[in-house]
Amino acid sequence: MGEKSENCGVPEDLLNGLKVTDTQEAECAGPPVPDPKNQHSQSKLLRDDEAHLQEDQGEEECFHDCSASFEEEPGADKVENKSNEDVNSSELDEEYLIELEKNMSDEEKQKRREESTRLKEEGNEQFKKGDYIEAESSYSRALEMCPSCFQKERSILFSNRAAARMKQDKKEMAINDCSKAIQLNPSYIRAILRRAELYEKTDKLDEALEDYKSILEKDPSIHQAREACMRLPKQIEERNERLKEEMLGKLKDLGNLVLRPFGLSTENFQIKQDSSTGSYSINFVQNPNNNR
């Protein structure tokens, strides 16, 4: 892991506020905004995982102490003057940000980085208080301010905004943010874990399983990922069987509609499955009622 700043006391305290699951977020944030839906199973799993992720967390949620002062530079007002409503209603135009940075000096980029850090910490405080809409807005403004060359910082901001959006039940937007965070930092375990949970909540079980497998490849000690890799294959199989039955039912209804003018129905066709191969065969029966 990279170097950790000793002066990152406040962001270090915020780690639990930005945990992947609601239980440990509640432990950090205190009484406000409990979420009983996810408390029943996640706390034990993540207590086992916390020790293994501790080093990763310190680096991911804190990117250096910075000066709070920020002098306005040319072109910055184009980003800063956007309303909070615009920030939250539309996604960032990455190409625009890259174009904006082309003529920036290193000093200007560093100032924008420092301002994005201030906005990130502001969002962290809002998240801890349960002000998730405000936190999302702060992370969005931080993303607009943070130069694209600081990929690690931007990956953290995307992951943090995903957490704020999760709290508002904006699951698809949160998945999109997690994907952007992972694209910028493929080893970002927390973002992968967060996306895996979101995939489960949106019934995208195959995608969730792939993310959990990816986590185990990076760190086999993550208990939540191990448990999911044992649990999800059976759930996926059961879902596929259910979908197959629904599909066959619809095909039967369609078949009856087509065969009815000929005095036939799907009862005239018996479907048998070969237990050894799993394949199906169809046999025509002239008088199906006589075979019962």
Swiss-Prot record:
GO annotation, cellular component aspect: cytosol; peroxisomal membrane
Keyword annotations of the record: Phosphoprotein, Repeat, TPR repeat
Pfam family of the protein (one): TPR_1
GO molecular function, one term: unfolded protein binding
Residues in TPR repeats: 116-149, 155-188, 189-222
Residues recorded with modification Phosphoserine: S83, S90
GO biological process: protein folding
InterPro entries named among the record's database cross-references: TPR-like_helical_dom_sf, TPR_domain_protein, TPR_rpt
Region (Disordered): 23-125
UniProt KW Phosphoprotein keyword: yes
PROSITE patterns noted in UniProt: TPR, TPR_REGION
Residue spans of biased composition, Basic and acidic residues class: 45-55, 75-85, 99-125
Repeat found in the keyword field: yes
Subunit-level organization: Interacts with the GAP domain of NF1. Interacts (via TPR repeats) with HSP90AA1 and HSPA8.
Name the UniProt record assigns to this protein: Tetratricopeptide repeat protein 1
